[in-house]
């Protein structure tokens, strides 16, 4: 009898969060109960049409993207191995990417369009770029005033590429001091109007601008109509997963197959817990700011996991690292003081057991490590890719152009 009661409670819980999801979490229309009923009774969309979403957290420092970069290198290697092509790139398997802070830099690099319409950079290229910026202690070697132009490092990587010049839709958040509200750089908006088309280098500089008393960044659209004064997205959207899902579920033109969260395949990658931050970074960042940023990121993770309900173990993967002890000396390190130590720490986090968000129960350790979850997600990406090749309509019309065999000249960002 108890088992039957538990099943009934589970069904009720799932129905409650389905209503919450449809009404509040991901921004569906605010109709009454009739609309909720129609959403629940709609015929299921084929699993071959799942929209694949990449979401990457990030802070203002290059170190904040190293865990994600290491995970993405592992993920890209896995899909290359399973696809049987060294030319395969992550942008060939994802339909949309969202990145905040250093995660926004990773998303922009992996999805920037190069020769033949192929992705310009590999995950290895992106990791190498972050490591070089770690060695140089930041995105720019020069200190700015109250307002400064985007870091020269981004100009070298992206040149004059804009949001329109990506192989798939890309979302990069920041916080606009002028309007005191979050601002989302979006290819969908850029495609509709030049007033929302920004250069990728400006978007990356904006999302990486320090929010703890550092210099803000001025950015303007390519036609000069829209201007913002930005600080890093950690203020409002350090974890952009919910923003990415909202974008997909409310953008039927690009994602006609996305009827609900069961039609999504999402991987969200964190930055590593701030308990593992280097002492130098902890000294610069107020404790309350770190707590607020981590709390907001965890809240998004918990809310997304709840919204996925019974699909949260199959359709939603969250990769997050905890503080890792140093090999020599006391304390913990996440990002570390050197690029070499940073790589070791990121790899160590991937070997940790994964942490899952559970409805009403907080967190629990999963049976798999972060690395094993990355590998399992790679299998799902390949399965989805295979279904689409079997004459299944694509989940997104974001166009990648060019086959996997199109050669792209190697360049160092």
UniProtKB/Swiss-Prot annotation:
Residues 384-413 are annotated as: Disordered. A motif (GGXR) lies at residues 58-61. Its EC number is 3.1.1.-. The active site is at 100 (nucleophile). Pfam families: Patatin. InterPro entries: Acyl_Trfase/lysoPLipase, PNPLA_dom. The nitrogen atoms of the two glycine residues in the GGXR motif define the oxyanion hole, and stabilize the oxyanion that forms during the nucleophilic attack by the catalytic serine during substrate cleavage. Possesses non-specific lipolytic acyl hydrolase (LAH) activity. Hydrolyzes phospholipids as well as galactolipids. May play a role in disease resistance. This is Patatin-like protein 3. It comes from Oryza sativa subsp. indica.
């Amino acid at each position: 009898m108890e088992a039957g009661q538990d099943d009934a409670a589970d069904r009720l819980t799932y129905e409650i969060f389905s209503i919450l999801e449809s009404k509040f979490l991901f921004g569906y229309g605010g109709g009454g109960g009739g609309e909720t009923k129609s959403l629940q009774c709609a015929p299921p969309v084929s699993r071959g049409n799942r929209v694949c979403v990449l979401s990457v957290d990030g802070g203002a420092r290059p170190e904040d993207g190293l865990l994600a970069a290491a995970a993405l290198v592992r993920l890209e290697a896995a899909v290359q191995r399973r696809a049987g092509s060294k030319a395969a790139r992550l942008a060939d398997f994802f339909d949309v990417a969202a990145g905040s802070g250093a995660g926004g830099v990773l998303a922009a690099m992996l999805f920037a369009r190069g020769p033949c319409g192929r992705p310009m950079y590999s995950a290895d290229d992106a990791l190498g770029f972050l490591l070089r910026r770690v060695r140089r202690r930041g995105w720019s070697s020069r200190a700015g005033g109250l307002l400064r132009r985007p870091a020269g490092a981004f100009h070298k990587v992206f040149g004059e590429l804009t949001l329109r010049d990506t192989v798939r839709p890309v979302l990069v958040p920041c916080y606009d001091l002028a309007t005191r509200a979050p601002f989302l750089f979006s290819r969908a908006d850029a495609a509709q109007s030049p007033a929302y088309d920004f250069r990728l280098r400006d978007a990356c500089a904006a999302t990486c601008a320090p929010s703890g008393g550092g210099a803000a960044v001025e950015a303007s659209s390519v036609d000069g109509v829209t201007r913002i004064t930005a600080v890093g997205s950690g203020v409002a959207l350090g974890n952009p997963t919910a923003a990415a899902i909202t974008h997909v579920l409310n953008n039927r033109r690009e994602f006609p197959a996305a009827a609900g969260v069961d039609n999504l395949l999402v991987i969200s990658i964190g930055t590593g817990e701030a308990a593992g931050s280097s002492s130098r970074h902890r000294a610069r960042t107020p404790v309350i700011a770190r707590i607020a940023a981590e709390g907001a990121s965890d809240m998004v993770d918990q809310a997304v996991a709840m919204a996925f309900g019974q699909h949260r173990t199959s359709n939603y993967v969250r990769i997050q690292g905890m503080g890792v002890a140093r090999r020599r000396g006391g304390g913990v390190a996440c990002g570390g003081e050197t690029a070499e130590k940073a790589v070791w720490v990121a790899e160590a986090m991937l070997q940790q057991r994964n942490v899952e968000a559970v409805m009403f129960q907080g967190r629990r350790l999963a049976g798999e490590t972060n690395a094993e979850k990355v590998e399992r997600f790679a299998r799902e990406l390949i399965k989805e890719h295979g279904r689409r090749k079997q004459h299944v309509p694509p989940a997104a019309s974001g166009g990648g152009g060019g086959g996997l065999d199109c050669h792209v000249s190697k360049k160092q960002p």
